[in-house]
Amino acid sequence: MKPVSQLLSAAIALTPLTAAADFMGLYLGAGSWQSAPAGGIGRTDIDLESTLNLEEESNGFAYMAIEHPLPLLPNLRLQHSEMNWTGSALITAGTDLNGNPFTTSQQADISLDLTHTDATFYYELLDNISDLDLGVTARLFDGEASLVGSTQQETIELEAVVPMLYGKLGVAVPTTGLVAELS
């Protein structure tokens, strides 16, 4: 009987007294990045860079993520991104943003707002020195594009929900609290 009690005592002594696992996590963040619009918009495919003279601007974002231990329910990340550009350009006759072509060439103020909010539902597949998250995102655009000339004005409302896949890979540097992420 003595060997059994010694074995049991050794097993208890080697067992950690606490187990560490994430119970709930709340993550908040904000940032800014330089972005430039590219491509065309409107019925006559107006070039955002060469025709409208929209240039690189600093735009901000903020996010919140909630993680929990329930395996069947996905985690949630909400992110709001402000994306606005303004400029001024000579608009030629026939330029058509939204079905009402400009009748004369004129100087116009341009604004492009691609502000959007992301709702991401994801599962945390790895959560140790490396993190792997996979899920889906619904991106809700709520913006507009407008051309305001001396005699005419046109506006397009830009409202749409865009479904996307979501993935995040992170690697932690042990004992430093630093993490490199790619999403």
Residue ranges and their predicted role:
Residues 21-84:
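Short glycine/proline- and aromatic-enriched beta-strand/turn motifs that initiate or cap beta-hairpins
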Residues 176-183:
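Transmembrane beta-strand segments that form the barrel wall of outer-membrane beta-barrel proteins
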Residues 30-36, 80-86, 125, 138-144, ...:
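Transmembrane beta-strands of outer-membrane beta-barrel pores
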Residues 38-52, 86-112, 142-157:
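Flexible, solvent-exposed loop segments that connect beta-strands
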Residues 22-24, 44, 56-60, 113-117, ...:
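Residues that define the transmembrane beta-barrel architecture of outer-membrane proteins
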Residues 1-24:
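Cleavable N-terminal export/targeting peptides
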Residues 28, 62-68, 119-123, 136-138, ...:
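Residues on the lipid-exposed face of transmembrane beta-strands in outer-membrane beta-barrel proteins
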Residues 68-72, 125-129, 171-175:
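Outer-membrane beta-barrel strand-turn architecture
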